[in-house]
Structure formats: structure tokens, C-alpha cells
């Protein structure tokens, strides 16, 4: 029995559902962050902000605001890793998977492979933030003490 504690069982359906769930968290929270930022600066929302690699940049205010939204989204998705993945070892795997599918989405949306250096830098920073913070949060919950006696104490 001791070898069975927190053993990893290969469950493809669970893994696929977690991938779909993390993609939903990623695009849902990114959409909310972009809508919030667009509302603050009274800009019209566009799918280009999410999928066009040329939008991200330091030189224009919309580019900087989109970059800020991506960074905030990485922090939000780290919470998604905590609540839905719950394993520190799998945080990097799911983070890279989410960003790989985002790369494919950007490639499909704009009909060209993302070549902007700022896009790649933002994605690298987001991967690092999401994976490290997600792993830290998951490890904190994994290392919590396990109560051995849950019965109430009696004053005998």
C-alpha cells in the first residue's frame, strides 16, 4: 500500500480533458484581460490582439497593452494550473502544450508563421511565468501537512 500513494495512472481521457480545460482557461482569461484593457483605454476589441503576432510591440500603446494582457494572463493561468492540474510535475508540460496550441492558432489565423521577435519574447516570458508560478503553487499544496487524526480530542 505504501507504494501506491500519489501514484500516477495513465489516463488519456483525463489528460485530453485537462488540455481542453487549460485552453479554455487560457483563451477565456486572455479575452477578459484584453476586454478590460480595451475598456480602460476605450479601444475596440479585436481577434488580432489575441492571434496576430505583429500587434505585440513596445513602440505602440496597443502593443504594450496587449503585452500586459498576455503577462497578466500567464498569472491567471498559473491559478488554473493550481486548481485543475494540481501536480507540480505536470505544470511545465501543460504550459508548453497551451502555448504550442496558441502558436498553431496564431499561425492558422494570420496564415503565416509568427516571426516577430517581440511575440516570441512575450511567449517565452509567459511560459516561464506560468510554469514557475504554477509549479510553486502546486508544490505548496502538495507539501501541506496531512492530518493523521481527524477525530476530535476528548478531555478524558
Swiss-Prot record:
Keywords carried by this UniProt record: Golgi apparatus, Membrane, Protein transport, Transmembrane, Transmembrane helix, Transport
Gene Ontology CC terms: cytosol; Golgi membrane; trans-Golgi network; trans-Golgi network membrane
Any one Pfam family match given in the protein's UniProt record, by short name: SYS1
Transmembrane segments: 13-33, 65-85, 91-111, 113-133
InterPro entries membership: Integral_membrane_SYS1, Integral_membrane_SYS1-rel
GO terms under biological process: Golgi to endosome transport; Golgi to plasma membrane protein transport; protein localization to Golgi apparatus
Membrane topology annotation: Multi-pass membrane protein
Locations listed in the record: Golgi apparatus membrane
Main localization (coarse): Golgi
Family (UniProt): Belongs to the SYS1 family.
Summary of the function given for this chain in its UniProt record: Involved in protein trafficking. May serve as a receptor for ARFRP1.
Assembly behavior: Interacts with ARFRP1.
Record-given protein name: Protein SYS1 homolog
Name of the encoding gene: SYS1
Amino acid at each position: 500500500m505504501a507504494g501506491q500513494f500519489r501514484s500516477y495512472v495513465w489516463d488519456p481521457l483525463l489528460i485530453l480533458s485537462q488540455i481542453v480545460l487549460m485552453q479554455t482557461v487560457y483563451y477565456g482569461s486572455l479575452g477578459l484581460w484584453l476586454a478590460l484593457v480595451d475598456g480602460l483605454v476605450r479601444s475596440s476589441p479585436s481577434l488580432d490582439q489575441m492571434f496576430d503576432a505583429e500587434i505585440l510591440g513596445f513602440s505602440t500603446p496597443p502593443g504594450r497593452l496587449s503585452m500586459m494582457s498576455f503577462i497578466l494572463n500567464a498569472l491567471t493561468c498559473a491559478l488554473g494550473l493550481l486548481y485543475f492540474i494540481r501536480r507540480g510535475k505536470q505544470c511545465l508540460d501543460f504550459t508548453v502544450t497551451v502555448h504550442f496550441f496558441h502558436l498553431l492558432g496564431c499561425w492558422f489565423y494570420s496564415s503565416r508563421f509568427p516571426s516577430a521577435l517581440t511575440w516570441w519574447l512575450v511567449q517565452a516570458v509567459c511560459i516561464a511565468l506560468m510554469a514557475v508560478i504554477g509549479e510553486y503553487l502546486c508544490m505548496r499544496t502538495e507539501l501541506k501537512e496531512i492530518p493523521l487524526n481527524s477525530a476530535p480530542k476528548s478531555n478524558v
